[in-house]
Amino acid sequence: MNVKIDNSWRKHIGAEFEKPYFTQLTDFVRQEYSTTACYPPGSLVFNAFNLCPFDAVKVVIIGQDPYHEPGQAQGLSFSVPAGVPFPPSLQNIFKEIQLDLGKPIPQTGDLTRWAEQGVLLLNATLTVRAHQAASHQRHGWEQFTDAAISALSAEREHLVFILWGGYARSKKQLIDRGRHLVLESVHPSPLSANRGGWFSNHHFSLCNAYLREHGEQEIDW
């Protein structure tokens, strides 16, 4: 696995690449990609970091692991390439944006436009075996992405961390609430959202209000 990651991130988490766990992780990922179908494509594994340099991050949305069906994963949490049908969680994200901000449902589920505005769409695990959710968990990715979250918390100010569902909410221990806004709710998956607590959480308007309050351009969701 060739680590092609924006240099701004190397300054802050580059030490992770030299640690034994990352060597083991690299060996595991190379073996997986060489012997079975895995997602996202190798060139997109670090897409979230490359589209959103460290000093440009305004918002962090934490996912669990990539979509595991063909043609969906593109290295950005919750995002799918243009032309791909919206997965159920993404449908509910767009419905909440419509409720919260009055914006129409977009034509594409490609969230690159968010990333380019400073939204780090970070899956805790950056790769997955085809058709097997969570298959690459507990091999080292979580240690790496925890380091990224911790670096942002310690070295930046006035970011918005958006945590949907129990897994993402477990990351709040890494975040200094005195320096940042943390927004939490249930996961947007239909199973969780339909029980209540997702719709009308107003995370998108709350996020933008906080950014404006601290002199930042709001996100065009």
Q: Which residue stretches match the model-derived regions?
A:
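Generic N-terminal amphipathic, Lys/Arg-enriched alpha-helix
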Residues: 1-13
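A polyanion-binding, active-site-adjacent surface
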Residues: 15-160, 168-170, 175, 181-184, ...
